[in-house]
Amino acid sequence: MGGMTVDYEKVATGACEKIEEAAGQFCVKGVPTECRRYGSGHINDTFLLCTKEGEQSHSYILQRMNTHVFQDPKGLMQNISGVTTYLRDRIIREGGDPQRETLTLVETKAGKDYYVDSLGSWWRMYLFITDAVGYDTVEQEEIFYQSAKAFGHFQRLLDQYPVSQLTETIPDFHNTPKRFGTFCRAVEEDACGRAQGVSSEIAFVMDRKEEMSLVMDQLESGGIPRRVTHNDTKLNNVLIDSRSGEAVCVIDLDTVMPGTAVFDFGDSIRFGANTAEEDERDLSRVSLSLPLYEAYIKGFLEGCAGSLTDAEVRLLPWGAKLMTLECGMRFLTDYLEGDKYFRVHRPGHNLDRARTQFALVSDMERKWNEMERLAAKKYI
């Protein structure tokens, strides 16, 4: 990459000190003209790299991977490479555009899909998908519906993928019974002396301990299939075409691993169909939006196009409830352990987050019959 005109000094900080070295190892077209931080992600360091080749401009996403969170980066990259290659083949066969409809890894000059710099940091690069935007909040029902279609379509395209080839990048990430076990230990150890002050929140979790293993038991017994799952199905992990308003591509594949589609569905509902912010202190503002819930079910099942089993569809409301309960349990566990995992911005922040999740669970329980009725409707 001779003739560089980019000043990397502004972004070459901390663990990203070797960004110029890393950028020079990938097979980009043209000469770099700009490199700046990009997006709202908190885990990896993400940059937009722009290049010029004659009159043509090209854009790439360059990422330094967080190997504290993802401790098997090689396995993670094998997952992403395998899944995106498979998706590309399916998309081409169905007449789609693989450069817009799935992530495309850019190889290094050594023919790999990642680079380890001289300080030991792991880097990767993707083609940048133009004329597409991500949304951090559900601004319109249609956008939530489009994201649901995208995640459902992702499930359908990968329904024959050999799941056994996937590495579990974060072991037991959505294993609710194990999360419950961790929570119980945190209560028992009470490392920070906080348990007495949250006895009602602890009781809320304990009252639902019989439900914790409902989906995992079905998965372990073969009652529902083990599938390729995304495991971070937030709205902002779907790109929406800025002209047509339709979903284009599912992104952020770091947590792609074996799991259940029921939990992928449920985590989207937890995040997107809540009428309040995740850390809302006024719990009267927290509720499940049934119109958003229905829009998401409709989009998800349309995207799946019949690839889910009847047992999976019946469990979708449980996915929503258990993902919300699990998330609240994780926030409360972290609060009891001294706020070591989730970043906090005020005293009691994790407790506020836990209370919000539990309030959402309570509202789901009030609306349970309607949640089940909507899941049973025929959308396709």
Language model regions located:
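Conserved ATP-binding subdomain of kinase catalytic cores across diverse folds
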Residues: 34-38, 42-188, 258-261, 272-273, ...
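All-alpha amphipathic helical-bundle segments outside canonical DNA-binding/catalytic cores
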Residues: 308-320
